[in-house]
Swiss-Prot record:
Binding site for FAD: 57-87
InterPro entries referenced in this protein's UniProt entry, alphabetically: EF-hand-dom_pair (IPR011992), EF_Hand_1_Ca_BS (IPR018247), EF_hand_dom (IPR002048), FAD/NAD-bd_sf (IPR036188), FAD/NAD-binding_dom (IPR023753), NDH-2 (IPR045024), NDH2-like_C (IPR054585)
Annotated positions binding NAD(+): 221-257
Gene3D superfamilies: 3.50.50.100
Enzyme Commission designation: 1.6.5.9
Cofactor binding summary note: Binds 1 FAD per subunit.
Organism placement in taxonomy: Eukaryota, Viridiplantae, Streptophyta, Embryophyta, Tracheophyta
Predominant cellular place of this UniProt entry's protein: mitochondrion
Transit peptide: 1-35
A GO molecular-function descriptor: NADH:ubiquinone reductase (non-electrogenic) activity
Any single GO CC term annotated in Swiss-Prot or TrEMBL for this entry: mitochondrial inner membrane
UniProt name for this protein: External alternative NAD(P)H-ubiquinone oxidoreductase B1, mitochondrial
Residues annotated for Ca(2+) binding in this entry: 391, 393, 395, 397, 402
Family named by the database record: Belongs to the NADH dehydrogenase family.
Length: 577
């Protein structure tokens, strides 16, 4: 006993010895478990890790793309950072469709949050809990832990903040369609992908039970995907490969009964992509036997049937199914809706921010990713102030030189101006001043200036709800906070047109780096900057390299690539676990 006590003290003082001892024990076939538990000392550690500090407290809600990218770059020597999330990991969500069919394992695409924050040279507090309410007036968030339910009254807690970062993503939007919540699968979380994987196997197992009619087998093996966006299309492609590369080999008696259908309310699938990609995807799905029903809207879902309306004819169709995956629309989480009501945004569908990601209607609260949308200010709302600021000599007219002097600030503050100039192929400021007949003008009055910019706001577009947008926003916000004091004294943003001075920071600017659409059969489509489109087998290898490089850690990168190799050699696993 004394020997164990001495050994315990040595291992506690020299952690490297304990690691070496564990390694040696495992390598020789033994198993050593060394642990020290002291509740009281644990409480003291928590107290010591939370000293009174003059650092501003930043509370981050969410560990998705926006929250994680913010945590990786924020200066924790300047801020007391605390993170609240109901999941203690980051998930590489673009690979969720691959998880549904076993191409990639679930644990290969997740990285524990504590692994991410421990790499920072400082301390970030993480609380595995769900946010229940935001109180912007008192600058507090109310949270509830989903663990330790036996500790009555100790699951709820609140945190005060100086700055709040809301990066909680979105939940599924059913558009109040009857039966969707009860009968459909979703694909937003890792758990969703795992449930889909089990259900696919269940459908096949049910279909080989003796005594079933052909109609019953066809119904069980009819897989329906509602939504023809990137998630729905990629899942349909993954499922097709899983079925025809793996499952038909072990369920050969029912291979002729399998059917995959994609229901899309729009005229084409992948309608946010280039038309060439959309057309290529539809043609490939047709060759693969995947049915694409465009121009159809689902009106209700029962336990065995989907009811949909064909827009062109107005006819209602009843479709039997074995499994439905709902992959369309994003909705707002309940506590975010409550927060929106508090800040006067109750009529909006999604949380509104300005171009600096600040939530409108309150101070010191920022929102990133799918839970928010940038409410870009319109040029025509400030047209008089812009004209007055540009008219330096107060002549009542604006010369080309005066306009050119403020054009850079206008483009930064109102990015739709730059889009308008490019789309209209207007190379210089003077091109905006041309009259209706195309003649050049040296100067314009306020009415002429309004006419010149009257169509600019038509170029405004909402940012897509993608991981790429959220990640860039998280990085942008962290860099703004890191340079807060510097930019307060030396502003680097565009000029204030309605007042004097400049904005402290440049507004957020999204840089589209391209998007992929895996289409199955080791083929993919890519849309990259510069109107460059690529489709086929070579694009699939580009997809592999990009997605491997974008993994959050070397551990997940190794696991994901290993899963791809395993699938090529051994195929996908069909076990129901």
């Amino acid at each position: 006993m004394r020997g164990f006590t001495y050994l315990s003290k040595v291992l506690h003082s020299h952690s490297s010895y304990s690691k070496l001892l564990v390694l040696c024990s495992v390598s020789t076939g033994g198993l050593l478990v060394y642990a020290e538990s002291n509740v009281e000392s644990g409480k003291q550690v928590v107290e010591q890790n939370q000293p009174e500090s003059k650092k501003k407290r930043v509370v981050v809600l969410g560990t998705g793309w926006g929250g994680t990218s913010f945590l990786k770059d924020v200066d924790i020597s300047s801020y007391d950072v605390q993170v609240v999330s109901p999941r203690n990991y980051f998930a590489f969500t673009p690979l969720l469709p691959s998880v549904t069919c076993g191409t990639v394992e679930a644990r290969s695409i997740v990285e524990p949050v504590r692994n991410i924050i421990k790499k920072r040279s400082g301390e970030i507090q993480f609380w595995e809990a769900e946010c229940l309410k935001i109180d912007p007036e008192n600058r507090t968030v109310s949270c509830r832990s989903g663990i330790n339910d036996n500790l009555a009254g100790q699951n709820d807690f609140s945190l005060q903040y100086d700055y709040l970062v809301v990066a909680v993503g979105a939940q599924v939007n059913t558009f109040n369609t009857p039966g969707v919540m009860e009968h459909c699968h979703f694909l937003k979380e890792v758990e969703d992908a795992q449930r889909i994987r089990r259900t696919v196997i269940d459908c096949f197992e049910k279909s080989v039970i003796p005594g079933l009619s052909e109609e019953e087998r066809r119904t069980n093996l009819h897989f329906v995907i509602v939504g023809g966006g990137p998630t729905g299309v990629e899942f349909a492609a993954e499922l097709h490969d899983y079925v025809y590369e793996d499952l038909v080999k072990i369920y050969p008696s029912v291979k002729d009964f399998v059917k995959i259908t994609v229901i899309q309310s729009g005229d084409h699938i992948l309608n946010t992509f280039d038309e060439r990609i959309s057309s290529f995807a539809e043609q490939k799905f047709q060759r693969d036997g995947i049915e694409v029903s465009t121009g159809c809207r689902v009106t209700s879902v029962s336990d065995h049937f989907i009811n949909m309306k064909v827009k062109s004819t107005g006819k209602h169709v009843e479709v039997p199914y074995g499994m439905v995956v709902w992959s369309t629309g994003v909705g707002t989480r309940p506590f975010v809706k409550d927060f929106m009501e508090q800040v006067g945004q109750e009529k909006r569908r999604i949380l509104a921010t300005d171009e600096w990601l600040r939530v409108k209607g309150c101070s010191n609260v920022y929102a990133l990713g799918d839970c928010a949308s940038i409410d870009q200010r319109k040029v025509m709302e400030d047209i008089s102030a812009i004209f007055k600021a540009a008219d330096k000599d107060d002549s009542g007219t604006l010369s080309i030189e005066e306009f050119r002097d403020v054009l850079e600030d206008i483009i930064i503050r109102y990015p739709q101006v730059d889009l308008y100039l490019k789309n209209k192929h207007l190379l210089e400021a003077k091109d905006l001043f041309r009259d209706s007949e195309g003649n050049e003008r040296e100067e314009v009055d306020i009415e002429g200036f309004k006419l010149a910019l009257s169509h600019v706001d038509s170029q405004m577009k909402s940012l897509p709800a993608t991981a790429q947008v959220a990640a860039q926003q998280g990085t942008y916000l962290s860099r703004c906070l890191n340079r807060w004091d510097q930019c307060k004294s030396n502003p680097e943003g565009p000029r204030h047109f309605k007042s004097s001075g400049r904005h402290e920071f440049l507004p957020f600017e999204y840089r589209h780096l391209g998007q992929f659409a895996p289409l199955g059969g080791d083929q993919a489509a890519a849309e990259l900057p510069g109107d460059w489109v690529s489709m086929g087998h070579s694009t699939q290898w580009l997809w592999y390299s990009v997605y491997a490089s974008k993994q959050v850690s070397w551990r997940t990168r190794y696991l994901v690539v290993g899963d791809w190799v395993r699938r090529y050699i051994f195929g996908r696993d069909s076990s129901r676990i």
